[in-house]
Design a protein with these regions (language model features):
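Short, structured active-site-proximal loop/turn typified by the sulfatase FGly-forming signature C/S-X-P-X-R
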Residues: 22-58, 64-65, 69, 99-103, ...
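C-terminal, low-complexity/hydrophilic appendages and adjacent surface loops
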Residues: 186, 312-313, 395-498, 554-555
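Substrate-binding rim/cap in mid-to-C-terminal beta-strand-loop elements of soluble/periplasmic
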Residues: 62, 69, 127-135, 271-274, ...
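Long, internal low-complexity/basic segments
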Residues: 2-9, 13-16, 21, 43, ...
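Short catalytic/ligand-binding loop motif for oxyanion handling, primarily in non-cytosolic enzymes
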Residues: 20-24, 53-58, 69-72, 102-104, ...
């Protein structure tokens, strides 16, 4: 039986952007808002974001469908990605159908909304900020999160309905300001790096604090045991954002310290919202969800950023829920997915699982509500680290990180519109193809990964091999494979999925492959390539190793051939 309408809770989602939830905070870091929520609610240790990048992850969060299935498999800032179709049901439209008033404040990044409070009505959300989207450009967290907090408090105080339950998203940018940080002059991007012109030094603000920073245990991973796609990701971020030279651990500590301060800034904004909940005595009628769209590598494996990387730092996000019916200060090792958010919201809105399946058949997520309200007596629907089950699916199909050697010829920079108006049209892809040729579509830099809390299997593949292998021989014939024991090897440095390496476990590969195939079949469906291989009007790869090395940052070394490709400029760390 559905929950009585007058007992259904309000739902407030506090969303941050790009926090490394695995980071051990040094002594002296105070996060009063986040610490209060953790102390008052239930936190999941294994919540996966499904795609570790802004637009795709937010598409999943607010539609309940995998990003590729709604056309948002890369950021809307790139020419090959459209905006979210208003015909796609969202959490806003679905909850409106259940009688909720739905509103959205802050970072959206699924379209290019007009500067109007009605800009998201077509997506099921009212009361958007009239000054437009804060998509996450340089220093936008510092500059605009305070305004989002003000808008949220004002809405709670003056605009929230009193006659029906409501759903409100308050979506901050920080700690995303870490994305464009340049820790010092020696952290140098490639001259043609797509993000080079956007980087900035640390801010000299009175609010900032210096902490006793330690580097993560897997910082010194030499990546020799990792698949080609991992090393390609490293080149991509080094060249486009900035490479820290060997021996400059001080700059890595600057980055980690800056990320903490960005988190402190967003915590201060969340505190304003929690204070308003106190003033209006809303805790007894409101479920508060604290989460993030994705993580941040933050020095893990000697890397920065997020995107085409399946490691825990980028793919696991914070997930804390304070519910009027839930316990306080509890933790669970349950595995969850951002695909589950929409289903869980609808459960709080009073729908039973059978009703959700009937009314919204496109939703493939699980209901996390039982484990979030009673973690000690509920069986997690995806299993847990202590009792593994189906696990969670993590994907990558983004062209922006497919081929870093092609990107730094200047191609990616010409196809990115980072906050300067509408995306370039697909005709620009043809123009760029004429100038630079195509990216190498044989590079194995896309992935499908499954984590059940105990183990993680990653299938790295190229855009030409979208078929789903169902046997171990098929898997190795079409893919680079990684398998990690997350209990024995939490830093993911020992790949036991590579037949050429010691410790290879074929039986475990087969077991995890079965889980991966099951999630692809039941959640993604037909796993087809979301773009045309002839997108650039050619498939010719024109760059040569010397083209890259000529203008590379100092100390770069050329050449590691990639799978199925000609010689490629390579792994210089």
């Amino acid at each position: 039986m559905s929950t009585a309408r007058d007992e259904r809770p309000n739902i407030l989602v506090l969303c941050m952007d790009q926090w490394d939830v695995h980071m051990d905070l040094p002594p002296g870091v105070e996060l009063p808002a986040i610490q209060r929520l953790v102390g008052a609610g239930v936190s999941l240790a294994n919540q996966y974001c499904t795609v570790p990048q802004c637009t795709p992850s937010r598409a999943i969060m607010w539609t309940g469908q995998h990003a590729k299935n709604v056309g948002l498999w890369d950021n809307t800032n790139f020419a090959w990605t459209d905006v979210l179709d208003e015909a796609v049901p969202t959490v806003g439209t679905m909850l409106r159908e259940q009688g909720y008033y739905t509103a959205f404040k802050g970072k959206w990044h699924l379209s290019h909304p007009e500067r109007s409070s009605d800009a998201l009505e077509g997506y099921g959300f009212s009361d958007y900020q009239s000054w437009g989207d804060n998509w996450g450009g340089p220093l936008q967290g510092e500059e605009l999160d305070g305004t989002v907090a003000f808008e949220t408090v004002d809405w709670l105080r003056h605009k929230r309905p009193r006659d029906r339950p409501w759903f409100l998203v308050s979506s901050m940018v920080n700690p995303h300001d870490i994305m464009f940080l340049r820790a010092g002059p020696d952290e140098r991007p490639h001259a043609n790096g797509a993000m080079a012109a956007l980087t900035h030094p640390p801010q000299d603000l009175g609010f900032m604090r210096e902490y006793d920073i330690e580097l993560p245990g897997n910082f010194s991973d030499d990546l020799e045991a990792q698949p080609y796609g991992v090393r390609s990701y490293k080149r991509n971020t080094d060249w486009n954002y900035g490479r820290i030279p060997e021996g400059r651990e001080d700059l890595w500590k600057v980055r980690r310290n800056y990320l903490i301060n960005c988190l402190r800034m967003v915590d201060a904004e969340f505190q304003k919202i929690l204070d308003e909940l106190d003033r209006q005595d809303l805790w007894r009628s409101t479920v508060v969800v604290l989460t993030s769209d994705h993580g941040e590598m933050n020095g893990g494996h000697g890397m920065t950023q997020k995107g085409a990387i399946p490691f825990q730092e980028a793919s696991i996000v914070n997930m804390t829920v304070v519910s009027p019916r839930g316990p306080s200060g509890d933790h669970s090792d349950a595995v969850g997915s951002h695909l589950d958010l929409a289903t869980t919201f609808l459960s709080w809105a009073g729908l039973e699982q059978a009703d959700i399946r009937e009314r919204y058949p496109a939703l493939k997520g699980r209901n996390l509500r039982p484990v979030l309200e009673d973690p000690r007596r509920s069986d997690p629907p995806r299993g847990s680290a202590s009792a593994p089950g189906d696990g969670a699916l993590v994907n990558w199909d983004g062209l922006n990180m497919l081929d870093p050697e092609w990107a730094i010829q200047g191609a990616l920079g010409e196809l990115a519109q980072l906050g300067h108006g509408p995306d370039r049209t697909l005709e620009d892809c043809l123009r760029v193809g004429e100038t630079y040729g195509a990216p190498d579509m044989d590079k194995r830099t896309f992935f499908r990964a499954v984590s059940d809390g105990r183990h993680k299997l990653v299938r790295w593949f190229s855009p030409t091999r979208y078929e789903t292998p169902r046997t171990v021989p098929e898997l190795h014939a079409t893919s680079d494979v990684a398998l990690y024991d997350l209990l024995e090897d939490p830093g993911e440095t020992n790949n036991i999925g590579d037949p050429s390496r010691p410790g290879y476990d074929e039986e475990l590969v087969a077991s995890m492959l079965k889980k991966l195939v099951h999630l692809i079949d039941t959640e993604l469906g037909e796993d087809e390539r979301p773009f045309d291989l002839d997108l650039f009007g050619t498939r010719e790869v024109r760059y040569r190793p010397e083209d890259v090395a000529t203008d590379a940052p100092a100390e770069e070394q050329p050449a590691e051939p990639g799978p199925g490709t000609t010689e490629q400029p390579g792994d210089a760390f």
